[in-house]
């Protein structure tokens, strides 16, 4: 790969992936259609209030990472749910959809992205929960991921 990816580009990729996963969970729409909506949205949406928001394009966002997280979660959500279930304090169906999307994405990342330290995955999940999820969701997400990490990573 040669070129190192900036942490901000990965952070933006996670943010877009989380939103895409959430959209997929709610709409049950085709994964490719949702991905296409996200990848083409900025080309048509150049309003002033969007000027400060990150764009889903390189180099600002790691587009390949976005695609990996989104498609990885969509293709493996049943397996991911099974991996998180032992660490949940309530039934899976009682989780907020944003919490579920965030936990699925983070568990996928821990299991499949050895290039990212698990503490980075947890920290990024906490920060995303603070922005996108309910008020105390970041504490719940942190607790689940902290308990799950040792079994998902052998490091």
From Swiss-Prot:
Q: Which GO terms describe its biological process?
A: DNA-templated transcription termination; transcription antitermination
**Assigned GO CC terms:** cytosol
Gene Ontology MF, one: RNA binding
Keywords tagged on the record: RNA-binding, Transcription, Transcription antitermination, Transcription regulation
InterPro entries named in the record: NusB-like_sf, NusB_fam, NusB_RsmB_TIM44
The answer to whether UniProt assigns keyword Hydrolase to this entry is: no
Role description: Involved in transcription antitermination. Required for transcription of ribosomal RNA (rRNA) genes. Binds specifically to the boxA antiterminator sequence of the ribosomal RNA (rrn) operons.
Question: What family, per the record?
Answer: Belongs to the NusB family.
Q: Which NCBIfam families match?
A: nusB
Protein's name according to its UniProt entry? Transcription antitermination protein NusB
Q: What is the species listed in this Swiss-Prot or TrEMBL entry?
A: Aliivibrio salmonicida (strain LFI1238) (Vibrio salmonicida (strain LFI1238))
């Amino acid at each position: 790969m040669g070129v190192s990816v900036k942490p901000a580009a990965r952070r933006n990729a996670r943010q877009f992936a989380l939103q895409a996963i959430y959209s997929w969970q709610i709409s049950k729409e085709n994964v490719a259609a949702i991905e296409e909506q996200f990848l083409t949205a900025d080309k048509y949406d150049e309003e002033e209030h969007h000027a400060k928001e990150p764009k889903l394009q390189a180099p600002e966002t790691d587009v390949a990472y976005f695609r990996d997280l989104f498609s990885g979660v969509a293709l493996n959500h049943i397996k991911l749910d099974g991996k998180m279930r032992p660490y949940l304090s309530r039934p899976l169906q009682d989780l907020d959809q944003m919490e579920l999307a965030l936990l699925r994405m983070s568990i996928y990342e821990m299991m499949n992205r050895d290039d990212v330290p698990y503490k980075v995955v947890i920290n990024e999940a906490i920060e995303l929960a603070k922005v996108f999820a309910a008020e105390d969701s970041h504490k719940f997400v942190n607790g689940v991921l902290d308990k799950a990490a040792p079994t998902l990573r052998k490091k």
